Amino acid sequence: MSKLFEVLERLAATIETRKGGDPTSSYTAKLLNDPALAAKKLGEEAVETVIAAVAQGPDALASESADLLYHWLVLVAASDVSLDAVADKLAAREGTSGLAEKAARPS
């Protein structure tokens, strides 16, 4: 198993402990209390990740990817979507052509 998955599992658990926390003393609690803000931050991090990928090199991409994954985990938690629900969606798509899967989605 990749070290990434172990780190993400620990990070997700830490994020869960911040639910109900004081948003004035915890950035994570602040995002968890405001899913729209969490979504905005994820969007910003996605753009920064793309910029790093095309213009800043591997180290910047790794750093921005870490920020992106953190903010994604926070948004999922803030929206009360379990990681298992996301995993189920991914598992259901395994073995299916990306083009076929996308075409089968409801509009």
UniProtKB/Swiss-Prot annotation:
Top class in the EC scheme: hydrolase
Catalytic reaction(s) noted: 1-(5-phospho-beta-D-ribosyl)-ATP + H2O = 1-(5-phospho-beta-D-ribosyl)-5'-AMP + diphosphate + H(+)
UniProt cross-references to SUPFAM superfamilies, sorted A to Z: all-alpha NTP pyrophosphatases
Alphabetic keyword roster: Amino-acid biosynthesis, ATP-binding, Cytoplasm, Histidine biosynthesis, Hydrolase, Nucleotide-binding
EC number: 3.6.1.31
Origin superkingdom: Bacteria
Pathways per UniProt: Amino-acid biosynthesis; L-histidine biosynthesis; L-histidine from 5-phospho-alpha-D-ribose 1-diphosphate: step 2/9
Gene3D superfamilies: MazG-like
GO molecular function, one term: phosphoribosyl-ATP diphosphatase activity
GO process annotations (BP): L-histidine biosynthetic process
Matching Pfam families: PRA-PH
Cellular component GO terms held in the UniProt record: cytoplasm
Subcellular compartments: Cytoplasm
CDD domains to which the protein is assigned, alphabetical: NTP-PPase_HisIE_like
Similarity annotation: Belongs to the PRA-PH family.
Name recorded for this polypeptide: Phosphoribosyl-ATP pyrophosphatase
The organism of origin for this protein: Caulobacter sp. (strain K31)
